[in-house]
Amino acid sequence: MEYNYPKFTPEMKKTHTILIPNMAITQFRLLEYALRYDGYKCEILGNCGSAVAQLGLKYVHNDTCYPALLVIGQFLDALNSGKYDLEHTALLITQTGGGCRASNYIHLLRKALVKAGYPQIPVASLNFSGLEKDSGFQMTLPLARKCIACIFYGDMLCALRNQVAPYENEKGAADRMVDRWIARLGRALLAGKGFTSREMKHTFPLIAKEFATIPVTRVPKVKVCLLYTSDAADDR
């Protein structure tokens, strides 16, 4: 028998807090501002660590993609924390709409919520393919444009941070610059500014110019690529 899952309705936009997994730290911090500007009350989750992954493994088959374990574990850990009004909380997860199993994460999450004792929690889908047509969360063209702008800003901040951080004279200077620009961009985004291509073309050089002011010592560095997320580790 098919489970009749709770739907995220348009009315919930005003009454519910939407929890969002932190899948790309810098980009998602900016995406939160875009969603808030569009009228959604949302929060990017910051809980992480091996306990989160183990909680996801408890409610999801171990053959499932590891990102699904992390995302579902992060959601369940947040709901278990007691910080949220469970009658006015919703979850948001992405759907690719392609052949990847990521399109099915939303169904795995709904099953996990029932198993964990949260059958009343609605899950909204963030996708660009017209999936979940009965959902009250709609990716409109204006919202999509705002989200894309946030991703561009986030990608640039990450690229500049990675170019500066290994050589900075003062440890943490690049990360502090990222935080300052996220706060600055956030204020602009909440005011409805910074989304257009003209505004982005104006802002990108300003960001690069400020990163260039960070004192660095350019010395040869061994380059190692680490595929890593703090959500999956103790981060020690």
Q: Can you annotate each of these PLM segments?
A:
Residues 1-231, 236:
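An N-terminal assembly and electron-transfer interface module characteristic of large anaerobic redox
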